[in-house]
Amino acid sequence: MARNDKNDKNEQTDGLVERLVTVDRVAKVVKGGRIFSFTALTVVGDGNGRVGFGRGKAREVPAAIQKALEAAKRNMITVELNDATLYHPIKARHGASKVYMQPASEGTGVIAGGAMRAVLEVAGVKDVLTKCYGSTNTANVVRATFNGLRDMSTPEKMAAKRGKSVDEILG
């Protein structure tokens, strides 16, 4: 199986940063042999807390990428950020992929692997420390990162949920 990672491909359309995470060639085995097609995984974001991911599959690479981008734009969520980092450490998983993300001080940068880096950068996270455990399947790592960002809560939300003030939560 051929794998072509193209993390350096960034395009800007309608204010969204599009990042191609991976393109894979897949095969369907039929009576007469194999039918090859391509799957693409993309992430899009506005660099200010909105992020989405999508997968597309087609017989040609450009068509698969286009389908993935359309799916990513439909699948966008809003992530509340603490300036350019996270509010608190996050553990998330999808399948056998587990990710850990921790807020970092200003100037640290995005310390992350390829798939996680793509999601965090298009979301607008500038300073974060991350680690991926278990399966490093690109699609599952992207989904786990996405789940973690979606489930992150602000101190205001935590305080309201617990019936306390923000000062009590932050200690």
Curated annotation (Swiss-Prot):
The keyword RNA-binding applies. InterPro entries: Ribosomal_Su5_D2-typ_SF, Ribosomal_uS5, Ribosomal_uS5_bac-type, Ribosomal_uS5_C, Ribosomal_uS5_N, Ribosomal_uS5_N_CS, Ribsml_uS5_D2-typ_fold_subgr. One of its GO terms (cellular component) is small ribosomal subunit. Part of the 30S ribosomal subunit. Contacts proteins S4 and S8. The N-terminal domain interacts with the head of the 30S subunit; the C-terminal domain interacts with the body and contacts protein S4. The interaction surface between S4 and S5 is involved in control of translational fidelity. It comes from the Bacteria. NCBIfam families: rpsE_bact. GO terms for biological process: translation. Residues 16-79 form the S5 DRBM domain. Belongs to the universal ribosomal protein uS5 family. The gene is rpsE. PANTHER family: MITOCHONDRIAL RIBOSOMAL PROTEIN S5. With S4 and S12 plays an important role in translational accuracy. Located at the back of the 30S subunit body where it stabilizes the conformation of the head with respect to the body. Keywords: Ribonucleoprotein, Ribosomal protein, RNA-binding, rRNA-binding. GO terms for molecular function: rRNA binding; structural constituent of ribosome. PROSITE patterns: RIBOSOMAL_S5 (PS00585), S5_DSRBD (PS50881). It holds the Pfam family Ribosomal_S5_C. The keyword Hydrolase does not apply. This is Small ribosomal subunit protein uS5.
